[in-house]
Swiss-Prot record:
GO MF term set: 3-isopropylmalate dehydrogenase activity; magnesium ion binding; NAD binding
Protein name: 3-isopropylmalate dehydrogenase
Residues the entry annotates as binding Mg(2+): 226, 250, 254
Family stated for the protein in its record: Belongs to the isocitrate and isopropylmalate dehydrogenases family. LeuB type 1 subfamily.
Enzyme class: oxidoreductase
Site (Important for catalysis): 144, 194
Pfam families, sorted: Iso_dh
Encoding gene, per UniProt annotation: leuB
Source species: Pasteurella multocida (strain Pm70)
Length: 359
């Protein structure tokens, strides 16, 4: 029997509540599909600051190193906002984890599920068509990490600067992820750049075109970032796989999230070249609803499904979870973020229904 070790980092806010439901669903799936998951829990984020004085303790990092994947909840909250930026939960935990494990690729699916069209902020005739896309975002290069960056001078001559840097190998490896992802979907990649202005985007487009030659079955088109943000509003159904640099992917993936109607529905995966990944919901720690038992656990549950698919190659088990979510939603069950006039389900009730729906 295949056995996998998972580092469970519940974190802060709603993290522990939604992680509990993801594990509940994983426990059902591992019994039905004959594999074994070993969980080890570690502090991260604000709770780690409270208990250990740092958002990413050595024991947590070591536990992650000894695991096959990281199932991550959420970090942060008002309690720790007074700390220096580098010591705050988000910057002091997530960014070091991404760097330590060389998590260069972020996958963010965005799907408008049947029955949830009315929660989409787009016009009814657009949302009625539905959409199912994934953003493939380069995560470790680009303007967020390029050097030099800084501030200097004073008075009217004071200036600040950042540098957008991309190497050919960085673009090539993220492009290959996008094309491989498209091969398992609708075979369509849209590469987002600003090649009419930025030299880094000129190289980006050249390398993407080179990689595309290895995938003749995949349709490739290019779109400028400004036009991409417009077309996502006008015709989201056109897109399948969106390939983006770090900063453009940051923008696009959040726009995709917004048009689905709820951040509580959106999973994500951050992967390295060896298939090791950190899996987390796209939303934040939501301290305003933490402890109330009303958070939507679906994003966390779907993140667990992504873990089974991308790190463990358990595609059937992952699909079983995704189908369970679709079926529960199709039956009209909703948590508070998606409730209309019906009585909303609690976090636990939604987790129970999805676990029961796994086939």
């Amino acid at each position: 029997m295949q056995t996998f070790n998972i580092a469970v980092l519940s974190g802060d806010g709603i993290g522990p509540e939604i992680i509990a439901e993801a594990i509940k669903v994983l426990d059902v799936v591992q019994q039905k599909y004959a594999f074994k998951l070993n969980y080890r829990t570690f502090d991260v984020g604000g709770i780690a600051i409270d208990n250990h004085g740092t958002p990413l303790p050595e024991a947590t990092l070591k536990g992650c190193e000894e695991s096959d994947a990281i199932l991550f909840g959420s970090v942060g909250g008002p309690k720790w906002e007074h700390l220096p930026p580098a010591q705050q939960p988000e910057r002091g935990a997530l960014l070091p984890l991404r760097k330590h494990f060389a998590l260069f690729c972020n996958l963010r699916p965005a799907t408008l599920y049947k029955g949830l069209e009315k929660f989409c902020p787009l016009r009814a005739d657009i949302s009625a068509k539905g959409f199912d896309m994934v953003t493939v975002r380069e995560l470790t290069g680009g303007i967020y990490f390029g050097q030099p960056k800084g501030r200097e001078g004073e008075g009217a001559n004071e200036k600040a600067f950042d540098t957008e840097v991309y190497h050919r190998y960085e673009i090539e490896r993220i492009a290959r992820v996008a094309f491989e992802t498209a091969m398992k979907r609708s075979k369509h990649v849209t590469s987002v750049d600003k090649a009419n202005v930025l030299i880094s985007s000129v190289l980006w487009r050249e390398v993407v075109c080179d990689v595309a030659k290895d995938y003749p079955e995949v349709t490739l088109d290019h779109i400028y970032i400004d036009n991409a943000t417009m077309q996502l509003i006008k015709q989201p159904e056109f897109f399948d796989v969106l390939l983006c640099s770090n900063i453009f992917g940051d923008i696009i993936s959040d726009e995709c999230a917004m048009i689905t109607g709820s951040m509580g529905m959106l999973p994500s995966a951050s992967l390295n070249e060896k298939g090791f990944g950190l899996y987390e919901p796209a939303g934040g720690s939501a301290p305003d609803i933490a402890g109330k038992g009303i958070a939507n656990p679906i994003a966390q549950i779907l993140s667990a499904a992504m873990m089974l698919r991308h790190s463990f190659n358990l595609n059937d088990a992952a699909t079983a979870i995704e189908n369970a979510v679709k079926n529960v939603l199709a039956e009209g069950h909703r948590t508070a973020d998606l409730a209309d006039e019906s009585q909303p389900l609690s976090t636990k009730q939604m987790g129970d229904l999805i676990a029961q729906a796994v086939e």
